[in-house]
Amino acid sequence: MAVTDGDSITAAQYNGLQSRINTVMGTGSGDDGYGQVLASSQVSAGDIITAANFDNLRTDLNKANNHQSGTNAAIGDIAVGQIIGADASGTDLASLNVTTEGFNDYDAAVGVIETNKLLLNAGNSSVEAATTSQRTAAWGGGGGGTVNHTFTVTFADANARRHFFNAGGEIRFSATRTGGSGSKDTDWSTLLTNMGTIKMNRTQTTSTGSGTGTSIGNSDLTGTYQQIFSKSGSGLYAENLYRIQARQDSTSVLRFNVDFQDNDLGDDQGGAGSTGPVDENVTGTLTSTIQQLRATGSNVSVATPTYTNTANL
């Protein structure tokens, strides 16, 4: 809450600012909270608010703003000996044009951070390998077939899961098929290449390529599998399907099922003299790759979960 020119800044007002940044940077609840340890803390009623108090608060604001946008908050450093004003600070009237050092400037900076709490600047994150599954044996053909890659993502607790996604974390999916030269092999390779990388964040699942995403993210998961993404084949192989399903096993464990459905039942490709539809196997090497985008660095860094394969391709 802003203060009026001429008013004293009370412990309660400082604590109000500190509480708001703690909601974003600390444990929080729901879509608030990155799970970080703050430099600032509450002060006691009647305490004089010092430059050191504001230095610690500024540290927390700068870390949060950097995490979100890559720059420090629009506030100045308050030096020892300065008087903290409503909209400026200084040791005498002549220096009160320092317009980023007042209490209200800090108040406004916290407001920006609250608005941008779910943003993540790319420079404050890392894309990291999580798990993979690979198959070299032929599959599909002969009337259809499905191979699956199922894995769990285990967080330390429900808060750690929430902090991972609140801080901009994503679980990412991609796949490739190499080797082999059949037309079905080629279609699967094209399907997997064209879908790009699939990204599940806090509230949605999208892809960098083509396919059907959903408005289902971490906060929408239940104890029952939900389809969060799909991508179909094309032409003669339009029935073939790559699909991702997701559910929560508990408040701290997510489970994903990635299936590759060879639903094509064969097409009459043989020309004159053919005996009927031909349904080829899928050959070559099929790889399902899982990565994560995680908030990292000196501003906000969240713990990585553990990835465990429970079914391989």
Where are the predicted features?
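Detector for Asparagine
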Residues: 15, 22, 53-56, 62-66, ...
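Extracellular "spike/adhesin" assembly and maturation modules
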Residues: 1-136, 140
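Long, charge-rich C-terminal accessory regions
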Residues: 111-253
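Extended, charged low-complexity segments
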Residues: 203-313
